[in-house]
Amino acid sequence: GTCISYYYVDLLLEILLKPAGKLYYMRPTEAFFTYMKVSVVGGLVIAAPIILHQIWLFVKPALTVREKQLSNWILPVAIGLFGIGIVFSYFLVLPAAVKFFMGFATDELQPMFSIGQYMDFVLSFVLPFGFIFELPLILIILGYFNLITSRFLKTKRKIFILISFIIGAVISPTPDMFSQTMIALPMILLYETSLFVLAKIMKR
């Protein structure tokens, strides 16, 4: 996966760097290590579906008929949601975040991003959304096995909103409230979506 990613690393960097425009590297090794980091992360993303499929093949013999039926659609849905989360973050959240922070520029104060620092910001901002978008799938699976109900989710709504902002503060690449809110809001919307879908499923 890493070899494939490295082959296309220039294209990947062009895509990832687009929201910020021109960047600089402050240390002789900074550009090289940024290339390596993007290649490794890209390789992990490429390899993830294969790894998950191998894990599924390993545990499949021990599953019940009901669990096997459920697992047939879990993997493709999980991969799809992860991809949607990445795309959502890149096209909507990341440009808004970059624009917000560049808005502090003045005639005397101009932004000059380091490629290493910017790439750390991008990866720590974009990748978590892939996992955040798995939330509906996790909650629906728990509901499928009667471990939670839509009523339970309704009663825990306020707690989840608080948890969303705490998670936003933990995984946000910067300590400001804007970044935390940009992470927390999609989590809350996904929670409400999960609640709605779970309520529909339970009525059937």
Residue ranges, per PLM feature:
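Membrane topogenic/interface segments and analogous intrinsically disordered interaction regions
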Residues: 1-204
